[in-house]
Amino acid sequence: IEKGYGCKVEATKGSTTPIMAALFDQQIDIITEVWRDNLVQLIEDNVAKGTIVELGVNTPSSTQGFYVDKPTADKYGLKHVDDMKSEKIAKLFADPEAPGKGRMTSCISGWTCYTINLVKHKVYGLDKYYTNFDPGSGGALDAAIAGGFKKGKPVFSYYWTPTGLMGKVDLVKLEEPKYDQACWDEMTKVVEDIKANGPDVYKDTCACEYVNMSLTKAASTKFASNAANKPIIDFIKKYSIPTADVNKSLAFYMDESGGDMEATAKNFLSSNSMWESWVPSDVASKVKASL
């Protein structure tokens, strides 16, 4: 935007709640990663109020689930959560703190996904063979996966995309029962009860895969309604980046650029041509000249 359209740009990073609040208050012009499915009512309320304009999909596929390292998955034919249910397979992922059981590294206990995974373990019958292990932090979860790959050891873990780690390791997502809203709603009631009252209140329920989410883009109405900004809004609407490419860029950002956003952007623009279809040719020429 700066080099191609001649605008001064200030990039701001932040967590979901304050960043979205700033957009609604017209303090931020554009957000390029909105986890819309986690914020449906909030987004729709603000669209109705006229405070924001939605600009389409940034990353088309954001998934969560249970993953196994590809070498182990290929060797033992592990494609579905049901394939994990045997003592032979569980031994591959032995939990040193729970003799006789395998370990699935899960979410952090403070995150809702930890309890979701706990319920799924029981519904799927995985709890007979595996612990739902709390890694303690997001960094420890990443380290458990990366460490397994480094040592050539089997990995069985909860994880999600897009992330930098997914750009560096080869994990296979295990199939689960297909996402069903009614099933998810039923399971959520059990999850919320456990969060409030502890695991002893578990009741039989159904379970299914996490919904596959698209990450979207949005602009403040103040910015989008200014006619002078139309070329930028048109560009933001046009661009969409495949999840695999986002993973690669995040891996570059974390490991090769030293956390430098501009270097990461230049690497993406230099090594991909997909972006040229998002902008007029004169803008593309200016961007190329700046690399």
Where are these regions (language model features)?
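A bilobed periplasmic-binding-protein/Venus flytrap-type ligand-binding module shared by bacterial periplasmic
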Residues: 64-74, 212-228, 251-252
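Ligand-binding "clamshell"
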Residues: 41-55, 152, 166-204
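C-terminal functional modules
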Residues: 223-224, 233-291
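Short, polar/charged alpha-helical segment
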Residues: 1-6, 119-121
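Short helix-initiation/N-cap motifs at beta->coil->alpha
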Residues: 6-22, 132-143
